[in-house]
Amino acid sequence: MAKRSGVEIRDLDAVRDMPAIRRIWREIGWASDKRAEKQIPVFYKAGSCSVAAFDDEAECAVHAIPGQMQFDKTLLPLCVIAAVTTSRIGRGISLAQRLTARELAKARQRGDAVAVLGMFDQGFYNKVGFGTGAYVNEFALDPASLDVAIKPRTPSRLTTDNSDQMLASLLARPPLHGGVTINIPSLYKAELSMPSDGFGLGYFQGETLTHFIWMDGDAEHGPYKLRWMGYRDGAELLELLALLKSLADQVYSVRLIEPPHIQLQSLLKRPFRQQAIAGKGKFYADQNAYAWYQLRVLDVSQCVACIHHRGPALRFQLAVSDPVDEILAGDDLWSPLGGTYVVELSENSSARLVEKGDECPDLPTVCCTVNTLSRLLFGVSPATSLAITDGLEGPGPVLQALDTIIRANPNPGWDF
């Protein structure tokens, strides 16, 4: 890894480093106005942050916050890499890579089982063990095309002063595999406060906000961007979609990520016709599937224990390699994750790291990187597919059995 003399790697000092952090955000275009810049210190009050400094001036920072991730029926402790920022003079010398690895090590020491991040593009974070997440669907649609027959009630207007209630509504959504939650009220309010044109509409039951939408966009006819949608059940979700449809008198286009509990296309009137007519321009109609996030396992045993298989037990050896083992070699923060595990998938699944020389030669062996293992365990892609695309190696019958055992289609349902 390339190094630069005089680089100090340390924890963030909020008082000393904040002017430099603000400067970096301006340089990379994340703080477009004073309103957004005002929220920067709020973000860094939560979680953990590592910085790389030249002459005591921070030039790169990696910020991690705690969360939870649903693995089938189990909630796992989660590390969210929330911000990776590098100044104009700090690029090309692997600072972000080193700091990200450092935050992963700290998260692993805290007991986090998995880490996630939103990627600016695919490839960079693979160097620290991340694998690409599952596809999500993004829609641009005319709200009038929503095929929802119910008539919504008159909603209440919401502002950032309702942020705690909105967060509680998000946390009350039905759990789903791969679902992420980040319960940090100050951080959520700061995020809502950054765009100057954000607004919310929602419904109360007494003092409780039961379901809501939060959007931004100040043009007369849109397009609006739907940022957050909280609900407790399907009936409330349908009312929110009906509420969105009611805006069609004035709003021509809304962009949104598909709500994770439904297939939105089935609730659109003639979607292909809409896309053909409005395929280009400001108010286009479109549907795209892509993976915007990545994930990586931090604790193999914790993750494997979440798999509950009622059929015949599947036992095999798992040989894993992890690039962070080399990046942080000799660092007391990190104990190697790579090695050989004896894995059993059953009603009480387990993965046990074995010492060299204690391997079980009678068991079939599956070999992969931690990047591929992360995609495998969370069901991003089946084992037989990963054998084609990601270098997963193992006997065909074992890979086919993994295809049927591991739950598929994780969906974070949360922007991070």
Regions found by a protein language model. Give the residues of each.
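C-terminal hydrophobic structural anchor segments
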Residues: 315-377
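A short, internal acetyl-CoA/4′-phosphopantetheine-binding micro-motif in the GNAT/acyltransferase core
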Residues: 81-91, 120, 225-234, 372
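C-terminal interaction segments
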Residues: 353-416
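Conserved acetyl-CoA-binding loop-helix of GNAT-fold acetyltransferases
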Residues: 86, 91-105, 234-245
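Short amphipathic alpha-helix that is part of the acyltransferase structural core
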Residues: 1-66, 73-80, 146-186, 220-227
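Conserved active-site alpha-helix within GNAT-family acetyltransferase domains
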Residues: 109-113, 119-137, 261-280
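Amide-forming acyltransferase catalytic core, primarily the GNAT-like/NAT-type
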Residues: 135-227, 231-238, 242-247, 252-258, ...
